[in-house]
Amino acid sequence: MSLPGSKLEEARRLVNEKQYNEAEQVYLSLLDKDSSQSSAAAGASVDDKRRNEQETSILELGQLYVTMGAKDKLREFIPHSTEYMMQFAKSKTVKVLKTLIEKFEQVPDSLDDQIFVCEKSIEFAKREKRVFLKHSLSIKLATLHYQKKQYKDSLALINDLLREFKKLDDKPSLVDVHLLESKVYHKLRNLAKSKASLTAARTAANSIYCPTQTVAELDLMSGILHCEDKDYKTAFSYFFESFESYHNLTTHNSYEKACQVLKYMLLSKIMLNLIDDVKNILNAKYTKETYQSRGIDAMKAVAEAYNNRSLLDFNTALKQYEKELMGDELTRSHFNALYDTLLESNLCKIIEPFECVEISHISKIIGLDTQQVEGKLSQMILDKIFYGVLDQGNGWLYVYETPNQDATYDSALELVGQLNKVVDQLFEKASVLY
């Protein structure tokens, strides 16, 4: 008769040999055997070694289903695995169940299955009166609803959790839930509530020690909200802090998050028209040697187009890196403003050598409709981006040099204003005397 330890080794050997179906049967038989033995020893405590073997078997079988891509089997196994966890300590049950659910993240297109598994696990937690487990899984479920874009469901869970955590004065959980609430409101474009939630998260975080990942997420969210306010200088400083935090992490998604934040850092510098800073960041040792992705390449192409004031290069970069640029909500939301800025910059570059130029010639160079170019030039003149006059009858644009305002006029106006005040005061005093 083989011992559980030897069967565990046998299952691992089969996994290494890619005999996944056989390995699955060994793991299941090991769990069923342990379960039956636990039942037979009614009232007797199961030794720590057997519990550790059960825990290992559950986690390794979950990983096996991920490796196999057996989404349906993993969906069925996780709720079923709670039967084996009845003998576990409460803290260990939380750890094992959360680890199994997190493994689902590695399976593509499994968001609905993750939600189903979370809901079933919450039912188990309520049934067994595991309050801490229920809270932990509810946060996970609210996050999954957020990822699924089911914002109403996510907010309903968040509101319930906030009430409970405030009663318990659970600061770490309050930080996580307020941060998630801020993300949800940001997606709903309610920036005022998003900022309020983020402020609440930071207030709770100030009184406790926060894990590096939480600090990184708080800084990232702060940077995003400052970007929405077009305060790109402050946004960059938050993104930089977030990037440093992710850079020092070794979690499974820390590299991807660091690349994402680095992309936002470059976006901030582009929006500030600090292209030299973009080049310095791209040429930095950590960027060249560690962080390379299509998202960063996309921002590099946009920066070059912006530096050259070339709308054609900008549109080329947009087509080449459409997924990386338009698939990200933050970059997409800022691209209209970036397009307008680049269009203005490109038009200024074209008209720079001329005193008088045909609008049709500008339209031909920039590759846009004549009417569209004329409308934009008219707007730029009104905004005093450059000084000129449109001759619509002939289709010409007259460009003038920017007038130098004489400081003497301002001084004279100020002097007249002060004299006016003195005269008014003298008049008031005279009226009192008479």
Curated annotation (Swiss-Prot):
Consequence when changing F132L: In rpn6-2; temperature-sensitive mutant that shows defects in proteasome assembly when incubated at 37 degrees Celsius
GO cellular component, one term: proteasome complex
In-chain residues carrying the UniProt-annotated modification N-acetylserine: S2
Residue ranges constituting the PCI domain according to the UniProt record: 235-404
UniProt keyword Nucleotide-binding present: no
Keywords, ordered alphabetically: Acetylation, Proteasome
The family this protein is said to belong to: Belongs to the proteasome subunit S9 family.
Cited function: Component of the lid subcomplex of the 26S proteasome, a multiprotein complex involved in the ATP-dependent degradation of ubiquitinated proteins. In the complex, RPN6 is required for proteasome assembly.
Name the record gives this protein: 26S proteasome regulatory subunit RPN6
Species annotation: Saccharomyces cerevisiae (strain ATCC 204508 / S288c)
Lineage, opening ranks: Eukaryota, Fungi, Dikarya, Ascomycota, Saccharomycotina
Name of the gene encoding the protein in the UniProt record: RPN6
